[in-house]
């Protein structure tokens, strides 16, 4: 294995993802794609401290812009099915060009290495990376090409800069799915292939009872489509709004299933979910948790006259995200703390309509609890809502195991959680997977065609020449969803 070396280092101005100020950071780019940033220039590169910013340039796309500042460049990549961006600026066009060339060079090398490894691994199977990838994830090739015409389009569930999410009904089965549609032009630069779709593989390979499964993925001439499970037991948000508060036992049940899913993502997939909030938690027909990936919020943050335009709910943002420091796996445990606080206390731990004041509360305010909360629950929530991710419960090297061993979860057999042996505390009153009683009547009563599929959108009418950037993108889960 090649030794990891520092390829380039130097000062960059990084723009905050949420509080959109520019902060100077000293960045090191390594040959393995690691791109890490520090407040001060590190004294000893052989004994680096924990960085403030830590991400990878593998499979990234690079863009140049002169807004909001001259000599700006953006690193864009697909995380799961969500497009994330990091924005930097430097002092001169030459300096920007230098960074872009080096980052692109590292990304290209990594892609080449991955392709070589896939060739070795695939043996007799097709030698191109994407073909081998499909061989790995799909036990049987789709019997027919999936197209947009096979669904009824019922309701817009979410909309963002890069696409939209629609509640759809598969005509053949009557089953409901969430279809996430991303515009190709934002993932593929003008003449440049984006090294994306790793997350397509993450989704295809993800097999966990409490995570939303990917049923199909396919493409049209201008879009990538992910068709994902849509659990019909209703949003947890809906049930909590109706009951105002859950018992500690009920919160423990949901919390355990969420921990099990996040543990799987962190340890098996090396994915930080980043977006845990009540609206992203649904119940299946039996009352088990399904964590969704329908969000377009991180994509919907606009640049505008005000530097603080948000999509979605900033109430869930962890302190390290607001401060634009490194957010590793511990960011998910903060999210768990917020949703479990809501379940047991009936309100958000920090809230103010004014975003500036809200950010101040998240960063500075001590957490308060209702008197009725038992000590074990207080201890768990205090641990999960620690401001410093290193001090946070789950913030150590043992990650989820720290939370699993907390006294609040004493008595929980974690293998039983995974195997769905625990009886859900609430069973949605649905009779089948096509029962829509927990769906908003506004969209179950009538069919709305969001985007009438035309012939151009039909997968079968699009030949490979017109979609060279995304070979072998189509996928169909074998067996039932």
From Swiss-Prot:
Phosphoserine (modified residue): where?
474
In this chain the PH domain maps to: 5-108
Q: Keyword annotations for this protein?
A: ATP-binding, Carbohydrate metabolism, Cytoplasm, Glucose metabolism, Glycogen biosynthesis, Glycoprotein, Kinase, Neurogenesis, Nucleotide-binding, Nucleus, Phosphoprotein, Serine/threonine-protein kinase, Sugar transport, Transferase, Transport
Modulation of this protein's activity: Activated in response to insulin. Three specific sites, one in the kinase domain (Thr-309) and the two other ones in the C-terminal regulatory region (Ser-474 and Tyr-475), need to be phosphorylated for its full activation.
Pfam assignment, any one: Pkinase_C
Give start and end of each Protein kinase domain. Answer: 151-409
Enzyme class, first EC level, given as a word:
transferase
List this protein's GO terms for biological process.
Answer: cellular response to epidermal growth factor stimulus; cellular response to growth factor stimulus; glucose metabolic process; glycogen biosynthetic process; insulin receptor signaling pathway; insulin-like growth factor receptor signaling pathway; negative regulation of apoptotic process; negative regulation of release of cytochrome c from mitochondria
Q: What is its EC number?
A: 2.7.11.1
**PROSITE patterns reported in the protein's UniProt record:** AGC_KINASE_CTER, PH_DOMAIN, PROTEIN_KINASE_ATP, PROTEIN_KINASE_DOM, PROTEIN_KINASE_ST
In its record, the post-translational modification comment is: Cleavage by caspase-3/CASP3. Cleaved at the caspase-3 consensus site Asp-463 during apoptosis, resulting in down-regulation of the AKT signaling pathway and decreased cell survival. Phosphorylation on Thr-309 and Ser-474 is required for full activity. Phosphorylation of the activation loop at Thr-309 by PDPK1/PDK1 is a prerequisite for full activation. Phosphorylation by mTORC2 at Ser-474 in response to growth factors plays a key role in AKT1 activation by facilitating subsequent phosphorylation of the activation loop by PDPK1/PDK1.
Q: What does this protein do?
A: AKT1 is one of several closely related serine/threonine-protein kinases known as the AKT kinase, and which regulate many processes including metabolism, proliferation, cell survival, growth and angiogenesis. This is mediated through serine and/or threonine phosphorylation of a range of downstream substrates. Over 100 substrate candidates have been reported so far, but for most of them, no isoform specificity has been reported.
Database matches in PANTHER family: RIBOSOMAL PROTEIN S6 KINASE
User: Hey, which family's this protein in?
Assistant: Belongs to the protein kinase superfamily. AGC Ser/Thr protein kinase family. RAC subfamily.
Task: State what protein this is by name.
Answer: RAC-alpha serine/threonine-protein kinase
- Species the sequence originates in: Xenopus laevis (African clawed frog)
């Amino acid at each position: 294995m090649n030794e990891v070396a520092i390829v380039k280092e130097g000062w960059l101005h990084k723009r905050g993802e949420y509080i959109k100020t520019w902060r100077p950071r000293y960045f090191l780019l390594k040959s393995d794609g690691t791109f890490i940033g520090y407040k001060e220039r590190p004294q000893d590169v052989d004994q680096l401290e924990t960085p403030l910013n830590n991400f990878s340039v593998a499979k990234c796309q690079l863009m140049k812009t002169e807004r909001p500042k001259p000599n700006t460049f953006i690193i864009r990549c697909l995380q799961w099915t969500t497009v994330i961006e990091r924005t930097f600026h430097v002092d001169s066009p030459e300096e920007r060009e230098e960074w872009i060339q080096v980052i692109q060079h590292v990304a290209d090398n990594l892609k080449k290495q991955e392709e070589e490894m896939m060739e070795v691994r695939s043996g007799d199977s097709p030698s191109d990376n994407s073909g081998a990838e499909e061989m790995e994830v799909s036990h049987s090739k789709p019997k027919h090409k999936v197209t947009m015409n096979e669904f009824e389009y019922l309701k817009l569930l979410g909309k963002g800069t890069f696409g939209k999410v629609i509640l759809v009904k598969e005509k053949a089965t009557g089953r409901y799915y969430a279809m996430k549609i991303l515009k190709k032009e934002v993932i593929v630069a003008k003449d440049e292939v984006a090294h994306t779709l790793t997350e397509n593989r993450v989704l295809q390979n993800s097999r966990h009872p409490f995570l939303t499964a990917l049923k199909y993925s396919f493409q049209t001439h201008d879009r990538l489509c992910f068709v994902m499970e849509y659990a019909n037991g209703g949003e947890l948000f809906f049930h909590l709004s109706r009951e105002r508060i859950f018992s500690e036992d009920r919160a423990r049940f949901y919390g355990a299933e969420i921990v099990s899913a996040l543990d799987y993502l962190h340890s098996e997939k090396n994915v930080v979910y980043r977006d845990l909030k009540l609206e992203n938690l649904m119940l299946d027909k039996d009352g088990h948790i399904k964590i969704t990936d329908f969000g377009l919020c991180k994509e919907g943050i606009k640049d505008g006259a005000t530097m603080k335009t948000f999509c979605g709910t900033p109430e869930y943002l962890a302190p390290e995200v607001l401060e634009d420091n490194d957010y590793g796996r511990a960011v998910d445990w903060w999210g768990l703390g917020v949703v479990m606080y809501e379940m047991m206390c009936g309100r958000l731990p920090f809230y103010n309509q004014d975003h500036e004041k809200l950010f101040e509360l998240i960063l500075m305010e001590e957490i308060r609890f209702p008197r009725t909360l038992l000590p074990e629950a207080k201890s768990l929530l205090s641990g999960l809502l620690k401001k410093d991710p290193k001090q946070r419960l789950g913030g150590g090297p043992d990650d989820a195991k720290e939370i699993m061993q907390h006294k609040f979860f004493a008595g929980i057999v974690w293998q039983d959680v995974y195997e769905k042996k625990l009886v859900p505390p609430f069973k949605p009153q649905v009779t089948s997977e096509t029962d829509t009683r927990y769906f908003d009547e506004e969209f179950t009563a009538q069919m709305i065609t969001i985007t009438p599929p035309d012939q151009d959108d039909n997968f079968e009418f699009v030949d490979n020449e017109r979609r060279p950037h995304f070979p072998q993108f189509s996928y169909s889960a074998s067996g039932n969803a």
